[in-house]
Curated annotation (Swiss-Prot):
UniProt similarity note: Belongs to the actinoporin family. Sea anemone subfamily.
Organism annotation: Actinia fragacea (Strawberry anemone)
Compartments where found: Secreted; Nematocyst; Target cell membrane
UniProt lineage: Eukaryota, Metazoa, Cnidaria, Anthozoa, Hexacorallia
GO cellular component, as recorded: extracellular region; membrane; nematocyst; other organism cell membrane
Chief location of this protein within or outside the cell: secreted
Name listed for the protein in its UniProt record: DELTA-actitoxin-Afr1b
GO molecular function terms attached to this record: lipid binding; toxin activity
Superkingdom as given in the UniProt entry: Eukaryota
Residues carrying the site annotation Part of the hydrophobic cavity (in subunit A) that receives Val-60 from the adjacent subunit (B): 16
Free-text note on domains in this protein's UniProt record: Composed of a long N-terminal alpha-helix and a core region rich in beta-sheet structures. Before the pore formation, the alpha-helix binds the lipid membrane, partitions into the lipid-water interface and stabilizes the monomeric molecule on the membrane. Finally, it traverses the bilayer, thus forming the transmembrane pore.
Free-text function comment from the UniProt entry: Pore-forming toxin (PFT) that consists of a crown-shaped octamer or nonamer that forms cation-selective hydrophilic pores of about 1.5 nm (inside) and 13 nm (outside) and causes cytolysis. It causes cardiac stimulation. Also causes hemolysis (HC(50)=0.4 nM). Interestingly, the Phe-16 is crucial for hemolysis.
Record key words, sorted: Cytolysis, Ion transport, Lipid-binding, Membrane, Nematocyst, Secreted, Target cell membrane, Target membrane, Toxin, Transmembrane, Transport
One biological process term in Gene Ontology: killing of cells of another organism
Further information: This protein has been found to bind carbohydrates, since it shows a substantial delay in elution profile in size-exclusion chromatography. The carbohydrate pocket ovelaps with the lipid-binding module of actinoporins.
């Protein structure tokens, strides 16, 4: 669903920020 996709995207952004 759109909600799940949004959560996945937000999680990816957070992970990307942590890895930088």
């Amino acid at each position: 669903s759109a909600e799940v996709a949004g959560a996945v995207i937000e999680g990816a952004k957070l992970t990307f920020n942590v890895l930088q």
